[in-house]
């Protein structure tokens, strides 16, 4: 027999190295074979539900870190809620219509114009479904648990039918209408765009000041005066029909070297500087309010028509001249104010952004090229007062990255103005994690214009509208519901395969079509109407889900996207928000906070992390960032995350190794009989558990990440597990002291594995499979630890002890530096009271102080001679008495021999004698 054979060293087959890239797919295969997703639901059937509704990612392209951040956060929530006993189904979804898929096929060489529309749409559908299969596999590889065998997909007939019915309800309530209005138009996509499809980039544009001669001053302005306007879109001047001034602002007629100009008085200095006027040359001749200027007539600078001076409240003094160039065909404010004055809506561009015949001399020119032609013309006729170039933030198409324009075209609209207040009220009834989230969506709804829902494309859900022979619109609810039923049965391709009369209910007649002829709308719906209908197409149609959802969680760009379109359609049809709680996350940047781009070489993708480090490293990283803002990732950050993972894994492994011979049924010590140090740790565990559960409830994963590290490092590694080695390895196997510690260690191991399960989904499952005597086949089928209020008095007492222990460790470190001792077991510590703390009285109730301090001997005295003064007592460290026990390495003055083993202390003699 040798000394080592007498020790109870940790034993476990749980590997030290994670090997996650290889291990995780095995665990996921096991989950699939167990049908874990449905088992979890079955366990919680009949319980209170918690519904997180998945915002559908677009079915095109590989996953980026934003996808991973989003889906992993959702998985934290659903796994946690499920372990809290909630019935929490998670149905992932995909958004499948729209321009990017059309473009992807065009890039592959598909010629859309050379085939029937329905054939092209079938190719789009095939492409979308292929993309979904790729993304689905990648989401599952991240450990996301959901109903991936039956996701919701916006191109499915049942979804499209639900969307059409929702449209029908909005139409029935007078919320859908057709109008010629200026909308964001993308010449590069040849389609209208919603606000959510716009992003801003810098653009270089001409900045011009133009003079409009007064034609009829109405007795207010001199007939030889000129109004000055400023614009950065010279190409819109052929559509100018008015000049707008603010009714309440003051304007002046200024004489500058014999020329008379009308300018806003607050802006005259800026205009003078721009146009190079000397101050002494400027003379104010007349003053008037904008209201007094109403109906003055000016001459268009190069077209034979009047530009009327009108009033509008949108005019500001932020820039320009206070007199605004007004073209109702090319601006929303212009259009609205133009309606009041019955101004014509001129928009002489085609879908490609090229001037039509209506554009006169500019016919055939691309709008951007027309800028030069217009300025040249103004220069020739003397109307151009100044031309320079500026760089400014300008709207671009989010898909093509090309500039967009405002263009008046016949479009379909969903009325925001009619439901705006109802939506704002619904926002007030919604809960938010952060106040700025509420402010953001509130302001967006408050300030947004009417929603243009039509698109001039083919890959999307058709607008279920018909026209009679005389042009009347047919938008009856019954007709729309009939179309919905056709879509549900045959899919939306039926719209393109059949004639209008075959899509209408049998025997349908209309006074506007005496010959029984009808035509159908050719536009499709905005993709935001698709995804914005998911509360109807998913929450209300799937039996396991319910409306409204408990939570919507997406990137912060969705305040103007999915959050916005969803609450609009839900309030319009159901009178309430589709979500009770709204949560958003930021974007993923590189390690320096820069946007990731291939050109910078700073792109990290989920697939790379999973293959190199494992999904649990990606998941742990998600828990380590403040996701409410933009977050950072880099190889260095992931290396730090992997280091934290290793520490967690090794701590769990150590605990596994030390409970291998423990059966809670037969070996557990009742709480009342536990050693006080073990009771302290049990109560620290309770305190820790309560805090972690609270953080999960509040979606505060960064706090969990930090507190787990703190508990592992401070409570376990630096104290309890270190202290425990002298008990777990050395004491008799069945001794009360050892079983007392194992009871608590087992509890810590089980509870910590559960608490980590939503985040480290694979590792927790692996640990669970090695914990002896657990009942559930998966940690994800277990319940979260119950929150038990800790014993505050006990915690307070031991918190003081831990501070005293810190002082002892400082004294030991000093003794080590002074070569008094080497290892701490070579020490004898003498502690006494001082003025700041009565250590002698405080320590009288503590047992096994030498083990708690990891030294060989401790003496507590009223006063210590020659001790170093610390806050928690005077402490002296000397070399321990006696010699080292060869088994436990503690020093003793009573070494002896048992069973052929020499140099054993009395404790070890007793243990070895019984072997």
Curated annotation (Swiss-Prot):
L-isoleucyl-5'-AMP binds at residue 554. Keywords: Aminoacyl-tRNA synthetase, ATP-binding, Cytoplasm, Ligase, Metal-binding, Nucleotide-binding, Protein biosynthesis, Zinc. Its EC number is 6.1.1.5. A motif ('HIGH' region) lies at residues 57-67. Its main location: cytoplasm. The keyword Ligase applies. Its cofactor is Zn(2+). ATP binds at residue 598. Catalyzes the attachment of isoleucine to tRNA(Ile). As IleRS can inadvertently accommodate and process structurally similar amino acids such as valine, to avoid such errors it has two additional distinct tRNA(Ile)-dependent editing activities. One activity is designated as 'pretransfer' editing and involves the hydrolysis of activated Val-AMP. The other activity is designated 'posttransfer' editing and involves deacylation of mischarged Val-tRNA(Ile). NCBIfam families: ileS. This is Isoleucine--tRNA ligase. It comes from Staphylococcus carnosus (strain TM300). The lineage of its organism: Bacteria, Bacillati, Bacillota, Bacilli, Bacillales.
């Amino acid at each position: 027999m040798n000394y080592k054979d007498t020790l109870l060293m940790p034993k476990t087959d749980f590997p030290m190295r994670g090997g996650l890239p290889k291990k995780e797919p095995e665990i996921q295969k096991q989950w699939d074979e167990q049908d874990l997703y449905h088992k979890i639901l079955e366990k919680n059937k009949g319980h209170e539900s918690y519904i997180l509704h998945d915002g559908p990612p677009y079915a095109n392209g590989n996953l980026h870190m934003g996808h991973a951040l989003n889906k992993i956060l959702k998985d934290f929530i659903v796994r946690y809620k499920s372990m809290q006993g909630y019935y929490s189904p998670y149905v992932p979804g995909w958004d499948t219509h729209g321009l990017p898929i059309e473009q992807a096929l065009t890039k592959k060489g598909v010629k859309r114009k050379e085939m029937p529309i329905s054939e092209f749409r079938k190719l789009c559908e095939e492409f979308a479904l292929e993309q979904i299969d790729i993304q689905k596999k990648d989401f599952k590889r991240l450990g996301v648990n959901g109903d991936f065998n039956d996701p919701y997909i916006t191109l499915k007939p049942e979804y499209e039918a639900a969307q059409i019915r929702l449209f029908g309800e909005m139409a029935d309530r007078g919320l859908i209408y057709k109008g010629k209005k200026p909308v964001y138009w993308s010449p590069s996509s040849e389609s209208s765009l919603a606000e959510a499809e716009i992003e801003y980039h810098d653009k270089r544009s001409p900045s011009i000041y133009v003079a409009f001669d007064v034609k009829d001053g109405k007795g207010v302005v001199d007939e030889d005066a000129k109004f000055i306007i400023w614009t950065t879109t010279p190409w819109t001047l052929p559509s100018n029909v008015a000049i707008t001034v603010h009714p309440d602002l003051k304007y002046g007629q200024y004489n500058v070297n014999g020329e008379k100009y009308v300018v806003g008085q607050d802006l005259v200095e800026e205009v003078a500087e721009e146009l190079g006027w000397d101050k002494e040359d400027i003379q104010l001749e007349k003053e008037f309010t904008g209201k007094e200027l109403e109906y003055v007539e000016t001459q268009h600078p190069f077209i034979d028509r009047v530009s009327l001076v009108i009033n509008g409240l949108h005019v500001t003094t932020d820039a320009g001249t206070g007199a605004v160039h007004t073209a109702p065909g090319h601006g929303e404010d212009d259009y609205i104010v133009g309606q009041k004055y019955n101004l014509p809506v001129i928009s002489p561009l085609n879908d490609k952004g090229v001037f039509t015949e209506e554009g006169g001399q500019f016919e055939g020119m691309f709008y951007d090229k027309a800028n030069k032609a217009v300025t040249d013309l103004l220069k020739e006729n003397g109307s151009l007062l100044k031309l320079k170039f500026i760089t400014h933030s300008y709207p671009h198409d989010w898909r093509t990255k090309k500039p967009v324009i405002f263009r008046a075209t016949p479009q379909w609209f969903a009325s925001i103005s009619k439901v705006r207040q109802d939506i704002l009220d619904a926002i007030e009834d919604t809960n938010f994690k952060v106040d700025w989230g509420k402010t953001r969506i509130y302001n967006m709804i408050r300030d947004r214009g009417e929603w243009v829902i039509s698109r001039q494309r083919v890959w999307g859900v058709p607008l279920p509208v018909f026209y009679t022979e005389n042009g009347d619109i047919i938008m009856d609810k019954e007709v729309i519901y009939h179309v919905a039923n056709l879509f549900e049965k045959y899919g939306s391709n039926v719209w393109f395969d059949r004639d209008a009369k075959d899509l209408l209910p049998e025997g349908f007649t209309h006074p506007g079509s005496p010959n029984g002829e009808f035509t159908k709308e050719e536009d499709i719906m905005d993709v935001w109407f698709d995804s914005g209908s998911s509360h109807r197409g998913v929450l209300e149609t799937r039996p396991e889900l319910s409306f409204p959802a408990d939570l919507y969680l997406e990137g912060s760009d969705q305040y103007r996207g999915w959050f916005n379109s969803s609450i609009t359609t839900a309030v319009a049809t159901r009178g309430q928000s589709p979500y009770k709680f709204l949560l958003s996350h930021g974007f993923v940047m590189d390690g320096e906070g820069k946007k990731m781009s291939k050109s910078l070489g700073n792109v990290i993708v989920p697939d790379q992390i999973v293959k190199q480090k494992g999904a649990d490293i990606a998941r742990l990283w998600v828990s380590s960032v403040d996701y409410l803002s933009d977050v950072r990732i880099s190889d260095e950050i992931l290396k730090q995350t992997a280091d934290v993972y290793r520490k967690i894994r090794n701590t769990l492994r150590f605990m596994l190794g030390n409970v291998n011979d423990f059966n809670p049924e037969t070996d557990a010590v009742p709480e009342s009989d536990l050693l006080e140090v073990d009771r302290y740790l049990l109560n620290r565990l309770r305190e820790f558990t309560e805090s972690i559960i609270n953080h999960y409830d509040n979606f505060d994963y960064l706090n969990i990440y930090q507190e787990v590290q703190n508990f592992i490092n401070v409570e376990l590694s630096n104290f309890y597990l270190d202290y425990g080695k002298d008990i777990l390895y050395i004491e008799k196997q069945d001794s009360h002291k050892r079983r007392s510690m194992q009871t608590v260690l087992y509890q810590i191991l089980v509870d910590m594995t559960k608490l980590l399960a939503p985040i480290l989904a694979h590792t927790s499952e692996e640990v669970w499979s090695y914990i002896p005597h657990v009942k559930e086949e998966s940690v994800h089928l277990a319940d979260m630890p119950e929150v038990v209020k800790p014993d505050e008095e006990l915690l307070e007492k031991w918190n003081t002890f831990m501070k005293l222990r810190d002082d002892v460790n400082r004294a030991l470190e000093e003794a080590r530096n002074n070569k008094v001792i080497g290892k701490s077991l070579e020490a004898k510590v003498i502690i006494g009271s001082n003025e700041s703390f009565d250590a002698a009285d405080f320590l009288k109730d503590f047992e096994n102080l030498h083990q708690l301090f990891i030294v060989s001997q401790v003496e507590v005295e009223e006063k210590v001679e020659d001790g170093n003064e610390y806050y928690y007592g005077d402490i002296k460290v000397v070399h321990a008495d006696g010699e080292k026990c060869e088994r436990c390495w503690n020093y003793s003055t009573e070494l002896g021999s048992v069973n052929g083993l020499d140099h054993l202390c009395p404790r070890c003699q007793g243990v070895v004698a019984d072997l």
